[in-house]
């Protein structure tokens, strides 16, 4: 310890910043644990079509002037806010986080609605491939197996499924927000580090474009999920079966045809 103090006080270290580990990084055994942190990305260049005052707007050249509080700083800002939901900075920050998180969940959810049905159509056996019917399998004999494998979590109880989801999803979300074994978190919305093993956010320009792609695809996924819900209520079929029916007979199997079935008096 004395040697280290003398080294730091020597002239060769004068004027230089020295990274000293915090107390949380020093274990009881005297070892230093390096915690992977995330650095914030540099601002995207002014040449990007998705950011800044000259960014792409929601109606292109016919959009008019965007509200003063929509400056094009964040991804997905097309200058449209007729309801004024983003006028308050605190509300805007909250809604922005909610939108990004919902985008991510709905993108996963949309895949979960489509792929089991797609696999079932190609010979892969499922207990129930239609997404809104799959949960009912837990009430049938044999219960519900995670990933269709009885050697994994075998549940005949909603509480067991709920507990698994709380542990698996809650732990990851907790690490994303507050850090933990995966490293210290600087930005909970874009934690990076161990949440970005491929290093997709290393380049600021590429990362800024990926943020735009994420929000655009996430918004489409939210509309898709809304469509899946409506289809399930109206037709009682999964999305791929509805698509196949529409392609086979587009005149009689479309949104307008089903909507007219609910006309009063018909």
Curated annotation (Swiss-Prot):
Q: Name one GO biological process term.
A: photosynthesis, light harvesting
Q: Which GO terms describe its molecular function?
A: chlorophyll binding; metal ion binding
Q: Which residues carry this modification: Phosphothreonine?
A: 37
Q: Which residues cross the membrane?
A: 100-120, 152-172, 220-240
Top-level taxon in the UniProt lineage? Eukaryota
Residues reported to bind chlorophyll b 2: 104, 153, 182
Cofactor: how bound: Binds at least 14 chlorophylls (8 Chl-a and 6 Chl-b) and carotenoids such as lutein and neoxanthin.
Tell me where it mainly resides: plastid
Q: Where does chlorophyll a 2 bind?
A: 102
Q: Where does chlorophyll b 1 bind?
A: 58
Tell me the residue numbers annotated for binding chlorophyll a 1: 80, 86, 99, 219
A GO CC annotation recorded here is: photosystem I
Which keywords fit this entry according to its UniProt record? Acetylation, Chlorophyll, Chloroplast, Chromophore, Magnesium, Membrane, Metal-binding, Phosphoprotein, Photosynthesis, Photosystem I, Photosystem II, Plastid, Thylakoid, Transit peptide, Transmembrane, Transmembrane helix
Where on this chain does chlorophyll a 5 bind?
Answer: 213, 231
Q: Where do the annotations place chlorophyll a 6 binding?
A: 246, 255
Transit peptide, start-end:
1-34
Q: Which residues bind chlorophyll a 3?
A: 137, 147, 214
Q: Which InterPro entries match?
A: Chloro_AB-bd_pln, Chloroa_b-bind
- State the oligomer form and interacting partners: The LHC complex consists of chlorophyll a-b binding proteins.
| Domain comment quoted from the record | The N-terminus of the protein extends into the stroma where it is involved with adhesion of granal membranes and post-translational modifications; both are believed to mediate the distribution of excitation energy between photosystems I and II.
Q: What else is known?
A: There are at least 16 genes for the major CAB protein which can be classified into at least 5 small multigene families.
| Family from the record | Belongs to the light-harvesting chlorophyll a/b-binding (LHC) protein family.
Report what the protein is called.
Chlorophyll a-b binding protein 13, chloroplastic
Gene name on record? CAB13
């Amino acid at each position: 310890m004395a040697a280290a103090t003398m080294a730091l006080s020597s002239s060769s270290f004068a004027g230089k910043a020295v990274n000293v580990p915090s107390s949380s990084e020093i274990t009881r055994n005297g070892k230093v644990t390096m915690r992977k942190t995330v650095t914030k990305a540099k601002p995207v260049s002014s040449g990007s079509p998705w950011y800044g005052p000259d960014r792409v707007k929601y109606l292109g050249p016919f959009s008019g002037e965007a509200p003063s509080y929509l400056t094009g700083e964040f991804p997905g800002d097309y200058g449209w806010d007729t309801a004024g939901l983003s006028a308050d900075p605190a509300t805007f920050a909250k809604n922005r986080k909610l939108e990004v998180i919902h985008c991510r969940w709905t993108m996963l959810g949309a895949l979960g609605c489509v792929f089991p049905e797609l696999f079932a159509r190609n010979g892969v056996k499922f207990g129930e491939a239609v997404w809104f019917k799959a949960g009912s399998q837990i009430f049938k004999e044999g219960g519900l197996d995670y990933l269709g494998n009885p050697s994994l979590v075998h549940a005949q109880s909603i509480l067991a499924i709920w507990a698994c989801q709380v542990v698996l999803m809650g732990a990851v979300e907790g690490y994303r927000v507050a850090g933990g074994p995966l490293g210290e978190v600087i930005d909970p919305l874009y934690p990076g580090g161990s949440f970005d093993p491929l290093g997709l956010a290393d380049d600021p320009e590429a990362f800024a474009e990926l943020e735009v792609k994420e929000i655009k695809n996430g918004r489409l996924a939210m509309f898709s999920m809304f469509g899946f819900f409506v289809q399930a209520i109206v037709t009682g079929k999964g999305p791929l079966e509805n698509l196949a029916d529409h392609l086979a007979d587009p005149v009689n199997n479309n949104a307008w045809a089903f909507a007219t079935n609910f006309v009063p008096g018909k």
